[in-house]
């Protein structure tokens, strides 16, 4: 066939269509393949099982009057059950006051539906000090309200209620802010012997065994913390009024958090903060918090880099978020990195919810954040941005030598009804610390301002509408 101009045009057009088709096919295949990784992760997360014996705390002297301190009775029941090979510690109907509860391997704490556990607000009830992390920094501090260290096969289940009783008159005032009850002359974590001292220990890499906080240091304990544990189940209970972070799995793996209701609007009341954890499922939970609803972390600054353990292989699905600084969050204590995160089918909305999807770090904290996949998120109202990536979080910390890298982030099928920004990204000048961000098939309505994207590398928007206008690039 003679190669005239018409034939050449037809051939070029045919090749172009073929290339577009192949590219689209590869994109679909690639997206499908990425989410297959989530199925693989899910297959590795297995809920723990427990021996059949049941140990009622009433048989160990617990009193359900809401006034008697039951710390010894509850922990005696746990010790007895552990020495008997494990089983279920039953919290029956009634109101029980307690201090720190320390779980042991092969123990399930089960709350009957009308059971309520009140936690003392006396700091002395959380001594002796235990090894922990506080805001991503290693130390010895007050025991978390419920704590486990180096355990396997542990659980808290049942439709009862855990109440930390924190408020402006006790733990929250330690923040050092008037909004949470602090007054001039009162001690707080801002004292030289508090948070600033721990920050100094971190920077100077003082041995952890010398970092003794606790009394007169005013660092609030988290509600639930499991440190270097395996095979964890948290299911069905309501948890409220935490002193600090609410659920804090730390350096742990094979974790299931399912059907939990978090109602805790105090300062730093993050809902669920897996830190340097692997293989995590957070499913069907409700979060109404005073800080981030779910925040993935991996240590702060030099401590995080010393461990160098990312949070990885996390699935979040079918959750609802109400109040909070962010719905799905990565950071800011993220020095060990974060990867292979899959979030889908969540709903979030509140005038007191600042952002829906949030990544936050800076050049002091650093961290590589990569392979993040988020889809099918329904957002009603947020007060700031639907999607925010901030590599200059807390600029008062100054510039550091550990620039972060946020890359390979895939966000699709997001709808929102009201926000100041649809997308807000802030990188670092002269650095490409935000790159390969893909936002597709999203519709943002009721947006007040243009998207703000500064100091970022490749950001691709495909089939994205803001206030009804297509903004593909």
What label would you give each PLM region?
Residues 1-11:
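Bacterial N-terminal signal peptides that target proteins for export
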């Amino acid at each position: 066939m003679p190669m005239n101009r018409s034939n050449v045009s037809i051939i070029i057009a045919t090749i172009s269509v073929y290339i577009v088709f192949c590219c689209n096919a590869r994109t679909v295949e690639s997206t499908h393949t990425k989410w297959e990784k989530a199925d693989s992760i899910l297959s590795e997360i297995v809920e723990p099982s427990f021996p059949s014996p049941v140990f009622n705390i009433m048989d160990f002297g617990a009193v359900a009057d809401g006034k008697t301190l039951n710390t010894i009775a509850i922990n005696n029941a746990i010790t007895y059950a552990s020495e008997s090979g494990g089983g279920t510690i039953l919290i029956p109907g009634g109101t029980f006051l307690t201090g720190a509860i320390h779980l042991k391997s092969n123990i399930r704490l089960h709350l009957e539906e009308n059971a309520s556990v009140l936690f003392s607000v006396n700091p002395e009830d959380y001594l002796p000090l235990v090894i922990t992390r506080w805001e991503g920094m290693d130390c010895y501090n007050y025991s978390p309200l419920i704590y486990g260290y180096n355990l396997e096969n542990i659980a808290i289940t049942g439709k009862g209620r855990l109440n930390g009783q924190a408020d402006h008159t006790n733990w929250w005032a330690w923040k050092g802010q008037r909004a949470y009850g602090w007054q001039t002359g009162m001690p707080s974590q801002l004292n030289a012997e508090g948070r600033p001292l721990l920050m100094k220990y971190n920077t100077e890499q003082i041995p952890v065994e010398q970092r003794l906080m606790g009394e007169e240091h005013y660092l609030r304990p988290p509600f639930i913390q499991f440190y270097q544990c395996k095979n964890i189940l948290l299911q069905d209970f309501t948890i409220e009024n935490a002193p600090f972070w609410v659920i804090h799995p730390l350096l742990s793996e094979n974790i299931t958090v399912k059907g939990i209701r978090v109602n805790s609007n105090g300062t730093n009341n993050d809902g669920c903060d897996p830190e340097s954890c692997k293989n995590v499922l957070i499913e069907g939970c409700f979060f109404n918090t005073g800080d981030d609803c779910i925040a993935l972390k991996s240590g702060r600054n030099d401590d995080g880099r010393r461990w160098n353990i990312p949070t990885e292989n996390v699935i979040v699905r079918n959750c609802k978020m109400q109040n909070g600084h962010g719905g799905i969050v990565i950071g800011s204590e993220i020095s060990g990195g974060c990867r292979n995160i899959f979030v889908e089918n969540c709903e979030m909305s509140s005038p007191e919810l600042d952002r829906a999807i949030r990544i936050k770090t800076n050049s002091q904290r650093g961290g590589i954040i990569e392979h993040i996949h988020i889809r099918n998120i329904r957002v009603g109202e947020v007060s700031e941005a639907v999607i925010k990536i901030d590599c200059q979080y807390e600029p008062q910390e100054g510039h550091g030598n550990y620039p972060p890298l946020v890359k390979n982030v895939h966000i699709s099928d997001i709808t929102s009804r009201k926000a100041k920004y649809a997308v807000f990204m802030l990188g670092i000048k002269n650095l490409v610390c935000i790159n390969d961000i893909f936002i597709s098939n999203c519709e943002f309505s009721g947006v007040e301002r243009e998207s703000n994207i500064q100091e970022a590398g490749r950001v691709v928007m495909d089939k994205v509408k803001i206030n009804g206008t297509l903004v593909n690039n």
